[in-house]
Every structure is written in structure tokens, then in C-alpha cells.
């Protein structure tokens, strides 16, 4: 009797130890599998159609997620140059090919970055795209900037050239030669536009020459009599200083109607 009891105890102990070992092994295996499954993150690609869009236009951001997750949500985030935190601005669903697309209207002239986030799933860590830098450009009047230097050219509320009144303009004042006004645009602008001509209040025999320079290089020069005007446009990539020179004869008043620069500030 004693021998049978002892044998049974050994069998039970052995069975219990084996079951415990198996349970521990299963738990370890389960834990290991979960960690392994979540060790990989989703890969999110992204590209933007324009890196230098115009104010109030729309940029398009599109890309894909792998491994595929059709129907899953992805979010679009933005961070502006003067901010530290990312802000979620839109959500989309992945199509059958695990691709997505977003559109965003850029309503302010400043640099921003976009990124796309795919949240974690049961067996995959969250993924995010690289940040996409976008610099928005908008037209602004040159007279909204503070002149670096000025001599004989004034900023005026309006100038009338060939019967057309232009707001926020420039015109010569008194000096027949050597008149100029200069602005620093700090290599943050892409183009200049305006209308050059002779102000309508000039005497009949007056004339004027308007010259526009970018970092000392002449980009435009034109001579005008009364009721003469010409549209002016040129690019100013990587230009630090923009100069407007005027020369007049016979009491003429040279003018630039509504000069504007396309800038990212």
C-alpha cells in the first residue's frame, strides 16, 4: 500500500511539473510572438505635388502604406514654422491598394511641414511618413516693406499712369537724377511685377526713365513720355536687395504703379 501511494505521488508530481513547464513555455512563446509581431512598424510613403505653392492654392499629398491595410485610416498632420506641435488636419481611408491622397488649401504665407500617420494595429507598430517641407508664396506690395534707403523717390497712396490709378505706388519727387529707393527682400522672394511709366500730373514735355535692379544688376529699364506706361515682370531668385532708380527731364514724374513682390513672408 505504501509503495503504491509513493508511486502515484511521483507520477502526479511529474505530471504537474510537466504541465507547469509546458504552461510556462507556452506563455513565453506567446509573449515572444506578440513582441515579434509588433516589432515592425508600418512604412508610410508621401510626396507633395508642389513645394512652393501660391497662397490660397491647394497642395496634394499622396502616398501608400505597407504592409497593405485597405480600409484603414491615415491622418494628415501639419506643423507651421513658428510652432512646435504637429496638428491633425484631415483623415482618409486607404484604398484597395493601400494608397491615400489628401488636399490642403494653403491659406497663409509661411513655411510648413506635412506628415502622414498610420496608427498601430494589433500586430504592427504605428508608422509615419518623412516630413514634407512646403513654402507658400504670395504677392505683397513693395511699399508694405520698410525701405533700406531712399533719395528722391517716395511711397504714395496712389499714382495715375496713362489714365489708370494704381494704389500703393512709387513716384519721383523733385530730383531730376540720382533718385532711388531700395528694399531688402532677403532672398525670400521669387518675382517682381508692376507698371512703369510717367505720372499723369507731369508737364506735357516731361519725360522719365525707370530702372529696376536686383543686387545691382539691371532687370528692367524704360523711358516714358506723358500717357505712356509698360507692364514689368521679372524673377528675383536669391536676390537680397531690390532697387528702383528714376531719372526725369522737363519736370516729368517717373512712377511705378503698384509694385509687388512674390514672397514667402
What is the meaning of each model-derived region?
Residues 130-265:
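Gly-Asp-aromatic-enriched flexible segments
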Residues 2-138:
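Low-complexity, Ser/Thr/Pro-rich intrinsically disordered linker/stalk segments at domain junctions
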